[in-house]
Amino acid sequence: MANRNTAVVTGASRGIGRAVALRLGRTHHVVVVARSRPELETLARDIRSVGGSCDVIELDVADTTAVARALDGVHADVLVNNAGVGYLKPLLELSSDEWHAMVDVNFNALFHVTRAVLPGMVERGRGHIVMVGSIAGRSAFVGGSCYAATKHAVMGFSESLMLEVRDKGVKVSVVNPGSVATSFSRRERDTSWMLTADDVADAVMHAIETPPRVLVHRIEVRAAVPKKG
């Protein structure tokens, strides 16, 4: 247990982040990050109940000062940037607060969280950063003027960062899922056709578990059968 590498997962309290943290808990010491301490504590108990180890950080990743303070000194061999928020509505119905929330959590937080742990990875000459993006980062849709824009930004950030740090021993991957049956899709009446959070966690783990000489930079995960109607 003492020799386990450490993985930091943001947005870990539910959905994809929770599924990824549970999977990483089998092989890594996991630091789970989210705003909801009760949900994080439940997750930590689940990880520990099967022999894993876990620390909890209650944190709003949109709070720049809090991110720097909370992650100061945190050793991360793996970082999964998963935190995200979405208000899917036409631009004329979108409030300024909703716009800024998506930009701050979906994109700006990537910079602040990554910037907090990347120096340690570079110093050690190894590390892996995984961004959980979206197929919205490669497309557009009605009601996605801001959400899709933030996911396009995730792609540009990830691809540029990969080129900056690959010669320093640090891998950068981005996993772009399609529709996932989580609380994010609660407005859908039928979610049976969607991916599950575990499906996305499988893709994240595939990227992480590749040999050191192999980089899987981009994975797109879609439901095998599209939505009907």
Model segments located where?
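Conserved glycine-rich cofactor-binding loop
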Residues: 13-14
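Conserved glycine-rich Rossmann-like NAD(P)H-binding loop of the short-chain dehydrogenase/reductase
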Residues: 27-43
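The beta1-alpha1 cofactor-binding region of Rossmann-like NAD(H)/NADP(H)-dependent oxidoreductases
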Residues: 58-69, 96
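Substrate-binding pocket helix/loop in short-chain dehydrogenase/reductase
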Residues: 90-91, 98-100
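Active-site helix of classical SDR
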Residues: 114, 150
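Residue(s) in the substrate-gating loop at a strand-loop-helix junction
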Residues: 134
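C-terminal helical subdomain
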Residues: 167-170, 174-175, 182, 189-229
